Amino acid sequence: MPRLVVAAAIVDSLDNPTQLLCAARSYPPELAGKFELPGGKIDRDEAPLQALHREIREEMNTAIRVGAQVMTEEGTWWPILQGRTMGVWLAELAPDAPAPTLNGSHSEFRWTPLDKVDTLDWIGCDLGIAMAVARTSGFEPADR
């Protein structure tokens, strides 16, 4: 059975989101430069939210405050690469957390207006999630 994956849709404010923090992959070569939501695999005996906080610390050197879970229209986790499924939560940077810093997993972090998330070069499965985040926040990407 494939491992489960978690990701954070980090917005500028859980109360009034207008921007999404998008992360460009550093590797593997076929995904380098493509954007994704930060996160990663759930370790054995680890709860999903524990994994989410750990992954954000490891990938971004920061901390988050977690909000509502973002589900598919069917109310399930999101299907992603290699037959895995991903749980996604809205989040914002924790009040006293340092700004995210690059540490090798990503080549760039970019705050993107929610109505423009579809203008980035996303890993295919993450584009639909980013657009769902935008729509649930009251924005309608052009879906170019």
Go through each PLM region and give its residues.
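Active-site-adjacent beta-strand/loop module that shapes the phosphate/pyrophosphate-binding cleft
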Residues: 3-4, 63, 68, 73-99, ...
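Structural detector for helix-capping/boundary residues
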Residues: 40, 54, 67, 112-115, ...
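Conserved N-terminal beta-strand and adjoining loop/helix that marks the start
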Residues: 1-20, 41
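Conserved Nudix-box catalytic region and its N-terminal flanking loop in Nudix hydrolases
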Residues: 17-62
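Short, charged/polar surface micro-motifs in flexible loops or helix N-caps
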Residues: 11-16, 28-29, 43-44, 91-98
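Nudix hydrolase/Nudix homology domain
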Residues: 32, 101-144
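A generic fold-level signal
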Residues: 1-3, 15, 30, 81-83, ...
